Swiss-Prot record:
Name of this protein: Regulator of MON1-CCZ1 complex
Main localization of the protein described in the UniProt heading: other
Functional summary from the UniProt entry: Positive regulator of the Rab7 guanyl-nucleotide exchange activity of the Mon1-Ccz1 complex, possibly by enhancing its endosomal membrane association. As part of the Mon1-Ccz1 complex involved in endolysosomal biogenesis possibly by mediating Rab conversion, the replacement of Rab5 with Rab7 during late endosome maturation.
Positions of the Mic1 domain: 462-616
Length: 642
């Protein structure tokens, strides 16, 4: 295993939850549903301290309860912390009601059965499921009547079970045939799901080899086993892919090691800890692997590395305090799903965190790294950093094929999100209040155009920037994503800077840039660079039928006749302002143009007002005088203003 350079991609949370360590007087229990840890002294007679994440000083409840004989096997609060369930005997469970944070010890409800109770789980504030050797039964606890009532049951022989609180699913190992059967357990509901396909009907699966968790929102049964050929250990990943579908072996994680292992899931990664080497292996089932018989075989993302060393600050009167270097992968460690590590002897409970930045150093394949970061909850900024490095000066645009693939990966996700947003906007009638709309869940990492523009702006005006921008634009077009304003303006700036006017003309003609008044005006602002730019802008304005702006541009360029023709066709004869066009024609100092424009409006006047004269409201007196002075032969009788 490679532990060089002190690079660690897994770390323990800096502030562990501290509790009384295991001793002759203190027993420690953990409830993985509420994420609460119980330190029970003298069977509860001298105190029970319950701690969990998120509470002030991590203390949830502290109380005492009577020792009713028999060692405590399991202890768990209801979700609202108002009923405490305690199992001391193999065939009974006690329910202690609470008022505030103190128990009502005079109102203990004892529920006894004739079976062997393997364990229990709370499924609601007042409902608990008992899992015994004969089946699963859901009970309602009625404190007011000091009763426990059965509301639902499933009869099945059970050897052991595993529980996934996030999915409310119990995995039952049956007495007959060693089958693994998932069961959905909710309030007043028990639903038996198709059994896990183990391949060999006689295969015996031990409880210690099975982990139940969720990966990418799908329930996963992880089974540790040795490879029949090599003898090395591997993990089978069986996924519950949908209602009514049997959990199927979809992936195999090749550990290539022997010894003791434990499994966590962190940020949708499967983390396999190897005690002998003191390393943790990372697997991502979303990444491609070797496919054999429709099963994907995965190797670790990188060579295994140790969890980051952890120094625990010990209680001390001095301000500096003493630091204890914790033993990693200790034999006293107990792991719970998804990412919990408990050292009962040390009295610490940690959560495992993923360190993204070191992994970016270890995964040299930039495309694979992109695929990896797109699935990480905090991968966006790191992915943007990676892309920024790829387009930076040191690469000088030589990694265009790699960038092309990366753009495809991020834009495929981006396109799905854009399409989903469009569907949500168009599927609802306008009178539906937005508060009632179901909000779309964005992808884990969403790289939008504005994110990319911020990266591209850092390499503006470099020789290869145009090539990278064209590559990104082509990728957007491939996924039918329209270029937005900021990106369109940046592409225009680069093309104009490089005098790539033919490329600019093609992009506009194929509508690959945003067609808007703002972008067209941005083009016009650069028209002094080359006359071709002005025509490109006019072409764009024509596509969006922004005739008013085109007319202004043409008038500014002295193309008065063209502007007049467009105004007549787009605005209608009666709405064409005579003064504006006569003034523009006068500014050209071309008598022929002025004459043509003047005569056009005379004919208009004749058609609209049955006279050649201009209405006084149009304020054309100076142009009438200019016409009369310039073309006296046309006006033997001076034309008045009507």
């Amino acid at each position: 295993m490679d532990n060089s350079n002190g690079i660690h991609y897994i770390e323990l949370t800096p502030n562990p939850i501290r509790f009384d360590a295991v001793s002759q007087l203190t027993n420690v229990f953990f409830d993985d549903s509420n994420k609460q840890i119980f330190a029970v002294r003298s069977g509860g007679a001298t105190g029970v301290v319950v701690k969990g994440p998120g509470s002030p000083d991590d203390v949830v409840i502290s109380f005492c309860m009577s020792d009713r004989g028999g060692a405590i096997r399991s202890i768990k609060f209801s979700p609202d912390n108002q009923i405490l369930a305690v199992q001391r005997k193999e065939n009974s469970v006690e329910f202690i009601c609470f008022q505030g944070d103190q128990p009502l010890l005079q109102d203990i409800i004892t529920h006894q059965v004739k079976t062997l109770i393997h364990g229990f789980v709370w499924v609601h504030n007042r409902e608990v499921a008992l899992i015994s050797n004969t089946g699963v039964e859901v009970y309602t606890v009625v404190p007011e009547k000091r009763q426990v009532r059965s509301v639902k049951s499933l009869s099945i022989g059970i050897k052991w079970f595993a529980w996934c609180c996030d999915a409310n699913v119990a995995l039952l190992c049956t007495s007959e045939g060693n089958s693994l059967i998932p069961v959905l357990v909710k309030q007043k509901v028990i639903t038996k799901l198709p059994k896990v396909d183990l391949g060999n009907p006689s295969r015996d699966v031990q409880e210690s080899k099975v982990t139940l968790g969720q990966v990418y929102g799908v329930l996963a049964v992880l089974i540790l086993q040795s490879n029949s050929t090599t003898g090395l250990m591997e993990v089978e990943v069986h996924l519950l892919n949908g209602p009514g579908l049997a959990p199927r072996k979809c992936h195999v994680l090749r550990l290539s090691l022997l010894g003791r292992f434990a499994i966590n899931t962190v940020d949708n990664l499967i983390v396999v800890h190897h005690q002998a080497s003191g390393t943790s292996l990372l697997f991502d089932i979303s990444l491609p692997g070797e496919v054999i018989n429709e099963i994907t075989y995965h190797t670790p993302i990188t060579p295994g590395r140790s969890i980051k060393p952890f120094g625990l600050k010990l209680p001390s009167l001095s301000p500096d305090g003493q630091i204890l270097q914790c033993e990693l992968y200790s034999t006293h460690w107990v792991l719970f799903q998804p990412n919990i590590v408990i050292d009962a002897k040390l009295g610490c409970m940690w959560f495992l965190n993923l360190c993204i930045e070191p992994l970016c150093q270890l995964i040299s394949d930039r495309i694979r790294l992109t695929e990896f970061l797109l699935q990480r909850s905090n991968g966006k900024q790191m992915l943007l950093k990676v892309i920024g490095q790829l387009v930076d000066d040191q690469y000088k645009g030589t990694l265009l094929p790699v960038l092309e693939t990366i753009f495809s990966r991020i834009n495929k996700i981006y396109a799905s999100w854009v399409q989903l947003e469009l569907q949500n906007q168009t599927a609802q009638p306008s009178n539906v209040k937005t508060t009632t709309l179901k909000q779309s869940t964005p992808p884990i990492v969403l790289i939008e155009q504005l994110d990319m523009v911020q990266i591209f702006q850092r390499i503006a005006r470099r020789p290869y920037t145009e090539s990278i921008l064209m590559l990104y634009l082509q990728s957007l077009n491939k996924f039918n994503i329209a270029a937005q304003e900021e990106l369109s303006k940046m592409i225009i700036s680069e093309l104009i800077s490089n005098r790539s006017f033919d490329t600019l003309r093609r992009l506009v003609s194929y509508s690959m840039l945003l067609e808007s008044k703002s972008v067209a005006c941005f083009l016009l602002s650069h028209s002094n660079v080359d006359t071709a730019i002005s025509q490109v802008a006019i072409d764009m304005l024509g596509r969006i039928e922004a005739h008013e702006i085109i007319i202004e541009v043409m008038l500014g360029q002295g193309k008065v006749i063209d502007a007049l023709r467009l105004a007549k066709n787009s605005m209608g004869l009666e709405k064409v302002p005579a003064r504006k066009f006569l003034e523009a024609a006068h500014k050209t100092k071309d008598d022929l143009i002025f004459h043509s424009v003047y005569r056009f409006f005379q004919m208009r006047n004749l058609k609209l007002y049955e006279t050649l004269s201009f209405p006084k409201a149009e304020q054309c007196t100076e142009f009438i005088q200019h016409y009369n002075n310039t073309f006296p032969a046309d006006n033997p009788t001076r034309q008045p203003v009507s």
